[in-house]
Amino acid sequence: MNLFTDFEARIKTALEQIDLVREKRSELDFGRIAVEPPRDASHGDVATNAAMVLAKPLGTNPRALADIIIAKLREDADVADVSVAGPGFINIRLAVGYWQRLLAAMIGAGTDYGRSTLGEGRKVNVEYVSANPTGPMHVGHCRGAVVGDALANLLAFAGYGVEKEYYINDAGSQIDVLARSVFLRYREALGEKIGEIPSGLYPGDYLVPVGQSLAADYGVRLHNMPEDQWMPIVKDRTIDAMMVMIREDLASLNVHHDIFFSERTLHANGAAAIRTAINDLTFKGYVYKGTLPPPKGQLPEDWEDREQTLFRSTEVGDDMDRPLIKSDGSYTYFAADVAYFKNKFDRGFDEMIYVLGADHGGYVKRLEAVARGVSDGKAKLTVLLCQLVKLYRNGEPVKMSKRSGDFVTLRDVVEEVGSDSVRFMMLYRKNSEPLDFDFAKVTEQSKDNPVFYVQYAHARCMSVFRQAREAFGDLDVSPEEFAQTVAGIGDPAELQLVAKLAEFPRIVEAAAQSQEPHRLAFYLYDLASSFHAHWNKGKDQPELRFVNDKNRESTIARLGLVYAVASVLKSGLAITGTAAPDEMR
């Protein structure tokens, strides 16, 4: 049950009973009515702007309209009190019985509480990470990996059909350079002295095992081949090895994709997929031959002072038209982007989400233009840009590169602080804002460490059940039994905790609609804070303690409340990709 959806329906029902509203119903936009928690909890449990947004089209005063609405709402047995504030806001305080029924519904739903049908029938592709397969993941990839993965989990929880995708950039010139780097390691494995790695090649030792495996399987045969013969063999082996490494890196962060899409498939069979995509745009009138004027600033790689085949992307929102085919007849990298989007659209996705680094900001308009041109505006495209992560240790900056010249890897960070700390902290700031990651801060056991604070709340919930079993021996109560004892929950402090739990479905939907998974991380911290505060009250007020060894019935009722808290924490942490431990060690 979504408290705010429920009361939105009740408020609209009350409005429909007002004569003036019925008379002008066709002129009114009920979609502008907001039902949400009041900014100040002391004002009530639910607030609405209904009178504010409807007064003008109804030709009346907001406060006067609010008084009429309030009179209708007072007839609702679940409304304990209702009042008007300021220019016409309506604040509603709910009856204890409503909170108790809501708690029973939460307990009955368990970890499914908060699931939504918001995205029902909509298919979404979330593409994230998509790092070049040229080496291990570095720390710069962490944030996009976590944001993309958590967003996909969030959308799935909100009812969308979601596929997590990784685009393997395995068709560019950087792959040729990588293959030549591996071939050098292959020669080294055969016993050749290769000396210092030449400038322009990849120097990392992670390529040594790939060269050794080629030497073991092919002996000197590759060495005796010209480059055009050994290149495809070495490329395939190298890309496979790099993707194994990348998948292992991502798995260490609890990131798992459904699809790994190879760019090379777009170039297969004479680049049939790219040709088809360009032909479709041509049919729609978006393709022409021409020469682009030199853009201001640094010239892009695909600019030529010659006639090229161009995408008329300025007609669909881009800053400039984009080359598809160079003057020599070869396809641009952008042409592959067009074909890739068409592939996604043809797979039936209603929305494509790209999670990219902030350095890809210049790609946004061209990708949006591709979406409009390819889908005729039928498919939605969203690009989320992730700002940089800066590493610190006890407040002091940590160099992002090692003495060897290699970057700090994703695996380095995960092995030092754990995947839970990395994931939750990467979500604890909006993706469009820079993030400071302090190794010391994310491992300390304090309120200042969000991941510890939230996980500790779940562990405390589990400890309550252990205490109850110790107090009552064979205590083994099912959620169904918990739900039958909610009448024992009525203290204002307990109801405040229920109210915080009641925000969860709204947070899920709001975060999914805005595609902002950090909202969920913030909410989990707030919920944990509310639970810890209630726990601490029990130290000074014995009547609020979860376990009363002299009152089994009261204990079972409060265990139901703890069960609901634990369920929401577990669900929320699962969406973020973070564990919900039963105890903290």
From Swiss-Prot:
Instruction: Work out whether the entry's keyword set contains Cell division.
Output: no
Record-linked Pfam families: Arg_tRNA_synt_N, DALR_1, tRNA-synt_1d
Q: Which Gene Ontology BP annotations are present?
A: arginyl-tRNA aminoacylation
What Gene Ontology terms describe what this protein does at the molecular function level? Answer: arginine-tRNA ligase activity; ATP binding
Domain of life of the organism encoding this protein: Bacteria
Reaction equations catalysed: tRNA(Arg) + L-arginine + ATP = L-arginyl-tRNA(Arg) + AMP + diphosphate
Q: Show the Gene3D superfamilies listed in the entry.
A: Arginyl tRNA synthetase N-terminal domain, HUPs, Isoleucyl-tRNA Synthetase, Domain 1
Q: What PROSITE patterns does its record include?
A: AA_TRNA_LIGASE_I
A single GO cellular-component term on record: cytoplasm
Where located? Cytoplasm
Cross-referenced SMART domains: Arg_tRNA_synt_N, DALR_1
What keywords are assigned to this protein?
Answer: Aminoacyl-tRNA synthetase, ATP-binding, Cytoplasm, Ligase, Nucleotide-binding, Protein biosynthesis
The entry describes its oligomerization and partners as: Monomer.
Q: What is this protein called?
A: Arginine--tRNA ligase
Organism per entry: Rhizobium leguminosarum bv. trifolii (strain WSM2304)
